[in-house]
UniProtKB/Swiss-Prot annotation:
Catalyzes the synthesis of the inhibitory neurotransmitter gamma-aminobutyric acid (GABA) with pyridoxal 5'-phosphate as cofactor. The gene is GAD1. The keyword Lyase applies. Coiled coil: none annotated. 4-aminobutanoate binds at residues 190-192, 567. This is Glutamate decarboxylase 1. The modification N6-(pyridoxal phosphate)lysine is found at residue 405. Its EC number is 4.1.1.15. Keywords: Decarboxylase, Lyase, Neurotransmitter biosynthesis, Phosphoprotein, Pyridoxal phosphate. One of its GO terms (cellular component) is cytoplasm.
Amino acid sequence: MASSTPSSSATSSNAGPDPNTTNLRPTTYDTWCGVAHGCTRKLGLKICGFLQRTNSLEEKSRLVSAFKERQSSKNLLSCENSDRDGRFRRTETDFSNLFARDLLPAKNGEEQTVQFLLEVVDILLNYVRKTFDRSTKVLDFHHPHQLLEGMEGFNLELSDHPESLEQILVDCRDTLKYGVRTGHPRFFNQLSTGLDIIGLAGEWLTSTANTNMFTYEIAPVFVLMEQITLKKMREIVGWSNKDGDGIFSPGGAISNMYSIMAARYKYFPEVKTKGMAAVPKLVLFTSEHSHYSIKKAGAALGFGTDNVILIKCNERGKIIPADLEAKILEAKQKGYIPLYVNATAGTTVYGAFDPIQEIADICEKYNLWLHVDAAWGGGLLMSRKHRHKLSGIERADSVTWNPHKMMGVLLQCSAILVKEKGILQGCNQMCAGYLFQPDKQYDVSYDTGDKAIQCGRHVDIFKFWLMWKAKGTVGFENQINKCLELAEYLYAKIKNREEFEMVFDGEPEHTNVCFWYIPQSLRGVPDSPERREKLHRVAPKIKALMMESGTTMVGYQPQGDKANFFRMVISNPAATQSDIDFLIEEIERLGQDL
């Protein structure tokens, strides 16, 4: 509201008396506060704020009248909604004698349902609050056998008879207690981190709606949201807004599989009906640093992992284009048909961006399908400062982009984008008559489910759409820029310190910062197999101590012939420089006696 003074229409004599406001003439400050506290939170705060700024009873009365009129015109909850207040007020409830059968749709089950869900919401809100509290642990680690044996009454076994709602609430608390707070500002273990509150609200709504994404008939709003969002993502990639297709999938591995299926169908459509026996020997190409899902898709789709050819990378983890072309020519000489090249925009370990422009030139030269796996790096397309790292992505035939990684959307949220419209539909449709009837009363082109390899499909779009509405493209851009700035901060802090050693030279391209912690016993020791063997054991030991203490989490792994090293990744917008400082200090503390 721009001004505390209501418009003339709210007080005009022509409007007549408002039956909802004519009795709002309290004569004391306390009475006015009572009115404010009886309203919805947003409205109540506005009224309380006004009361502190003015002593005019006339103005107070006019303000409340105007607020109530505005709320009513927008069909929002008003101060008079006592029915809502009564139904959703917490009351003392004995859940030890209540069971699932006592909740809706049970007769007279509304009150028990409301009280049970209020308790669940209280558990969830307490968890959310603690997630952002740096004094809380990232995890309370227990070994598998401890959880299986039961921790303080937390029993994972299933029973034949129902347990009380009291026990169900305890189970909810314990499930969160013994899990990992992946939204904690000091959780750096995976590419998917953070806990976005808008996204959380979206996921709650999605679960409440409990619908499926196969037809417009049962998910009209969600289907339209998905189409609009996918179109926007394709435009950001750089394709014409009239071109292309796409769908949300259960994750980047499945999105990558879609890309291989689309490529195969594009060049050999007969494979859909006749199978792999009807097509030549096909080979796929991907970098030695690419995600393992490409090889997994090769196995699942009948190519065989031997026919997924790995391309050499340079010291920064980028494809060497000359080796790609050499491997293509070698395959052709052996009688194979090169089909598909996967370029990675943001590798899992190094965060490297393959040279897409050069790879695209080779694909055009030999008529190969070019896919860009931007599951991790796709978020940088939202940043004007960093999108140049994906230069050439607009030349790709398909793109994998996981908003649940760099953009902080809650799991799961992965998109496969395809430049040519119709390929996904042609490749996957089976025209199931009980779902995809052609004679429905609406435009059946909105029944998008038949282009998916699934039948049932979770609604992944709403939380993402809602976050985009709440943040705007600029909000995502700022969030991504901040994470990359934190990676630069970490690199600058440790690159010249004797207790740390960088895995490769130069600033990281993404938020992946790869380094060894060098304990005192290995500092100044010349490189040798014995030193590498000892160094290989350092990161796992520190990680074990880290998990036992529960203070932070960061991943480690080997790469090629390199000893285990820490791979720090930042995708949580809640993280700050102080969290980076804490991580460095914690690694030093835990590793000082190794």
